[in-house]
Amino acid sequence: SECRWFMGGCDSTLDCCKHLSCKMGLYYCAWDGTF
């Protein structure tokens, strides 16, 4: 399955594209601070 981009809905960080993490409680992908 395709990864979720910035602000995409997610259930876990595994749903998000590289350098993004799922923000728990908000359930969207956001930058995880890595390059």
From Swiss-Prot:
It is found in: Secreted. This is Tau/kappa-theraphotoxin-Pc1a. Keywords: Amidation, Disulfide bond, Ion channel impairing toxin, Knottin, Neurotoxin, Potassium channel impairing toxin, Secreted, Toxin, Voltage-gated potassium channel impairing toxin. It comes from the Eukaryota. Selectively activates mammalian TRPV1, the capsaicin receptor, a non-selective cation channel expressed by sensory neurons of the pain pathway. Is less potent than VaTx2 and VaTx3. Interacts with distinct regions of the channel than capsaicin, since it only acts on the extracellular face of the channel, and capsaicin binds to the cytosolic side. Also activates avian TRPV1, which is insensitive to capsaicin. Significantly inhibits potassium channels Kv2.1/KCNB1. Coiled coil: none annotated. Disulfide bonds join C3-C17, C10-C22, C16-C29.
